[in-house]
Amino acid sequence: MSKLMTRTSGSSSPNTIPDQIESPTSSRSVTQTTNGSHQFVIQGYSLAKGIGVGKHIASDNFSVGGYQWTIFVYPDGKNPEDNSSYVSVFIVLASECTEVRALFELSLVDQSGKGKHKVHSHFNRSLDGGPYTLKYRGSMWGYKRFFRRSLLETSDYLKDDCLKINCTVGVVVSEMHCPRLLSIHVPDSELGSHFGKLLDTLQGSDVTFDVAGEKFQAHKLVLAARSQFFRSMFYNTLAENNSDVVISDLEPKVFKALLHFMYKDSLPGDVEPLTAHSFDLLRPSEIDDTLIVKLLAAAEMYNLSRLRLLCESHICKGISISSVSKILALSDKYNASELKSVSLKFTAENLAAVLQTKAYEDLKDDCPNLQSELLKAVAGYDDTSSSGGGKSQSVWAQLSNGGETSSRRVRQRTT
């Protein structure tokens, strides 16, 4: 903490202004860490063994402190000279940057329930040299001799051929606090809640919608402010005085959800989750009949881009190996570009497994136009994840025959 005090002085003559002391000021530099954690599960450890010394399996990227990170696990060790009998584990900086200072923790999870995890940590202990500094993308911190392989394979850390590694990153950040002598707290905006009350009370409503015989009241100004469609409906010369509107292309429950969004800028609470299990159970026609998908279609119909994104984000949570082909077909049908992009990326990263699913066979028959988009996504993924090349040579054959290939992909990357 640094403090500055200034003093002005003058003559002690009775005719001069007395000495004045300005109020002291202060500032405070606070250095702390922004922490985040990621769990990396390696399912099929026995299949990952034998990939070779210096070759690793990588986790998905995760974000902490504004930087991207990933975990590298070397089942056969990182270097042949001194640690080929060990499993090596490293945390890797995946962002382009100049310099990052951070603390790290790597934990091998005890899966027996005894809580005897193997922990290597910078946190809560004195560091002679301070936090670790990573200076460029690809810089890493970790242990070449993280665990002796022979001991690991007979330990409680390996269960059902599965390893779980927890990683915590603490990015060091510094802030300067200069408190003001006077301040007034301004609460968060209540605009959204006030508009929501308009919908709940219907006070001042000036338009009534008839949706399949069910009546809904609303406010023209609110709807016009939120949607170009309704702005044109209410404020062109032909329809300005029309206070009774028939909606023939939506069901009442969908229109009610649409109004909820228009007033409250969120999805209603009764929108059912579409989990991976839900997609497995439902046929495409049944998926189309869910409220969230009908709301997605309404967003496209009424050109509500934010509602479309909310629906896409909601559906995205159900992406899995078994469901991604159905979600790809859905995104193509309803012009959900963000959902399609995420689905294509997921498929590219898990290609071999997705090609074996029944849903992918249906996708080939129902949406043949997606084949070329999927090929581009897979080729792009291989370009970024492999330095050796040649991976995409048989991709088109795999996509065409539904995945009849002897290759197996465990999401390995070769350094």
From Swiss-Prot:
It comes from Arabidopsis thaliana. Residues 392-405 have a biased composition (Polar residues). The BTB/POZ domain mediates the interaction with some component of ubiquitin ligase complexes. This is BTB/POZ and MATH domain-containing protein 6. PROSITE patterns: BTB (PS50097), MATH (PS50144). Residues 205-271 form the BTB domain. Heterodimer with BPM1. Interacts with RAP2-4. Interacts with CUL3A. Binds to MYB56 at the promoter of FLOWERING LOCUS T (FT). May act as a substrate-specific adapter of an E3 ubiquitin-protein ligase complex (CUL3-RBX1-BTB) which mediates the ubiquitination and subsequent proteasomal degradation of target proteins. Disulfide bonds: none annotated. Signal peptide: none annotated. The keyword Cytoplasm applies. It comes from the Eukaryota. Residues 1-33, 385-415 are annotated as: Disordered. Pathway: Protein modification; protein ubiquitination. Residues 35-169 form the MATH domain. It is found in: Nucleus; Cytoplasm. InterPro entries: BACK_BPM_SPOP, BPM1-6, BPM_C, BTB/POZ_dom, MATH/TRAF_dom, SKP1/BTB/POZ_sf, TRAF-like. Pfam families: BACK_BPM_SPOP, BTB, MATH_2. One of its GO terms (biological process) is cellular response to salt stress. One of its GO terms (cellular component) is nucleus. The keyword Nucleotide-binding does not apply. Belongs to the Tdpoz family. Ubiquitous. Keywords: Cytoplasm, Nucleus, Ubl conjugation pathway.
